[in-house]
Design a protein with these regions (language model features):
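Terminal intrinsically disordered, low-complexity, charge-rich regions
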Residues: 1-131, 199-216
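Alpha-helical bundle/repeat cores within regulatory domains of eukaryotic proteins
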Residues: 143-216
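Amphipathic alpha-helical interface segments within eukaryotic helical scaffold
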Residues: 106-172
Length: 216
């Protein structure tokens, strides 16, 4: 699996960039509300378990925080001063211990990808062409790369790869003296999941289905 090292200019993403933030947020909420309504109707009719988009996104952000924490610890960069304690524990979120199990599976996929493609997840800011590291520029480039990753199809390996990119960017931020950007990266990852992946995850049955679909 190989993804572009640079962040291309994508017309659909540029259109999103042209929207002001409140307008974009309203559109995201409207799409999410419609999706939730359809899911509830199908659940009532067919007996499917309803997994809300908000539940998926909330858990995605917590998983992202845990993922970043694990990457920093493996590189000897994690301290309590980094601010990740602001994130709620995975165990306290809807899904509880099951989501903790999801994190173990997610880490397994992430480590496998990192072993196979070490250069892809090293110096991510440089690969994205970010000359001046700011929270906004990193979030913008991650969003563009994510759009390119998920535009054709979505798999759990691609989700794990996106998390690797976010965590690699977090490593770059800490090494360049900007640990205060980490929480913003988690928020940016949450927006990407909501925009590109949340509906797919919900249709799979939520994050817990990752344990069954990790070989996709």
């Amino acid at each position: 699996m190989s993804f572009p090292a640079t962040s291309p200019s994508l017309s659909s993403y540029n259109q999103l960039q042209s929207l002001d933030i409140p307008d974009a947020a309203r559109r995201y909420r409207r799409f999410s509300n419609v999706s939730d309504a359809v899911s509830r109707k199908l659940s009532t009719t067919l007996g499917w378990r309803t997994v809300s988009i908000q539940e998926v996104v909330t858990q995605a952000k917590s998983l992202c925080g845990q993922h970043i924490r694990a990457w920093l610890k493996r590189r000897g960069l994690f301290t309590r001063k980094l601010g990740l304690q602001r994130l709620r524990s995975v165990a306290s979120l809807p899904g509880g211990l099951a989501v903790c199990d999801v994190f173990v599976q997610l880490e397994g996929l992430s480590l496998e990808l990192e072993r196979k493609h070490p250069k892809l997840y090293s110096g991510v800011c440089r690969q994205m062409g970010v000359a001046v590291v700011t929270e906004k520029t990193i979030a913008k480039n991650l969003s563009s790369m994510a759009h390119n990753i998920f535009k054709k199809d979505i798999t759990w390996f691609k989700v794990a790869s996106f998390y690797n990119l976010v965590s690699a960017a977090a490593v770059d931020c800490v090494r360049q003296g900007h640990p205060e950007y980490l929480y913003g990266l988690v928020e940016a990852a949450g927006l990407v999941i909501e925009r590109d992946v949340a509906n797919w995850i919900a249709n799979q049955g939520g994050w817990v289905s990752e344990q069954e679909g990790q070989n996709q």
